[in-house]
């Protein structure tokens, strides 16, 4: 009898201890890595895209509209700096934690990489345009223009002619 009481107490204590050490917070499971992928793909990738024949890195960046070419290259370094190793049929990372989902809003193409998904007004950049001129023309602050077009570098030297930028939220 003493042995069964002691056993019952021990089992109760063990169960209580286990309950106290069990985490109460759920951790999101990582996305299953599809096959095939190139070496060096981001370990924390949560969203993958299967490249089609004829795709380019810039096309993928433009189609998703929520990350820059720099992000794409960082997540998929094996594609090469000039995207020379992008392979149709292979999977590429198009989202890590914190990356918004693919833009589903209608927008003109091509768009400046990193442009806002939801945009109230688009403008097709002309040869000779620069950030300051567009900010003045559309009465938008530099801070807001860059927020709407997150892929622009500090010098704004990557603003491209014949590409659409967001000029109004």
Curated annotation (Swiss-Prot):
Residues 47-94, 121-167 form the LysM domain. The keyword Iron-sulfur does not apply. Secreted effector that enables the plant pathogenic fungus to manipulate host defenses for successful infection. Required for the full virulence to infect insect hosts. Protects fungal hyphae against the hydrolytic activity of chitinase and plays an important role in evasion of insect immunities. Binds chitin and can additionally bind chitosan and cellulose. Coats and protects the cell walls of insect pathogens from host cell recognition and additionally shields fungal cells from the hydrolysis of insect chitinases. In plants, chitin acts as a microbe-associated molecular pattern (MAMP) that is recognized by lysin motif (LysM)-containing plant cell surface-localized pattern recognition receptors (PRRs) that activate a plethora of downstream immune responses. SMART domains: LysM (SM00257). It comes from Beauveria bassiana (strain ARSEF 2860) (White muscardine disease fungus). Pfam families: LysM. Disruption phenotype: Lead to relative tolerance against H(2)O(2)-induced oxidative stress. Impaired fungal virulence in both injection and topical infection bioassays using the last instar larvae of the wax moth Galleria mellonella. Impairs fungal propagations and ability in suppressing immune responses in insects. Belongs to the secreted LysM effector family. It comes from the Eukaryota. This is Secreted LysM effector Blys5. Keywords: Chitin-binding, Repeat, Signal, Virulence.
């Amino acid at each position: 009898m003493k042995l069964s009481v002691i056993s019952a107490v021990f089992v109760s204590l063990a169960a209580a201890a286990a309950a106290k050490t069990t985490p109460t917070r759920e951790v999101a499971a990582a996305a299953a890595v599809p096959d095939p992928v190139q070496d060096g793909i981001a370990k924390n990738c949560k969203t993958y895209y299967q490249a089609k024949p004829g795709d380019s890195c810039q096309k993928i960046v433009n189609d998703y509209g929520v990350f820059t070419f720099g992000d794409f290259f960082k997540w998929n370094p094996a594609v090469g700096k000039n995207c020379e190793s992008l392979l149709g049929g292979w999977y590429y990372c198009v989202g890590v934690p914190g990356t918004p989902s693919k833009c589903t809003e209608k927008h003109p193409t091509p768009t400046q990489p990193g442009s806002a998904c939801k945009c109230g007004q688009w403008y097709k950049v002309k040869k000779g345009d620069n950030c300051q001129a567009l900010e003045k023309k559309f009465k938008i602050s530099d801070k807001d223009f860059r927020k709407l077009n997150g892929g622009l570098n500090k010098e704004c030297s990557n603003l491209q002619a014949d590409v659409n930028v967001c000029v109004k939220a």
